[in-house]
């Protein structure tokens, strides 16, 4: 995997699930493949957009449904936010320093509440900093209905989550 870098632990593995659509399958798999094997040195910042690159036909992406300012539309790379959300959650539970993410403009029930993320080339990104003191390795895998992001390195913290009940937000 990343021999010689001192990578010895699975820091975290996170999986999200999605309903089948051909475009979604292609774009999610393409994004995961571009990101797979990324090594982030201590102090470096991982950027989803840098790892995955621009979503173009030449890079293997196809048109699909995406959300743009709260409206569904068809564009290249539709569905890649699934990988962004999975990556954000892996970073969240790894204890790495969270740098940048942007939630969708409305809640999507298949994503973890409060921990979903969208991306758009080149500025809307998912970023985290390797503050572990050791190199980390980003590994991806996928099926027809799920995508998994695992982060390997040297475990340095333990992260726990607690879910509070949903409440209505009232603006004053």
Predicted region positions:
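Well-ordered beta-sheet/strand-loop patches within structured domains
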Residues: 1-172
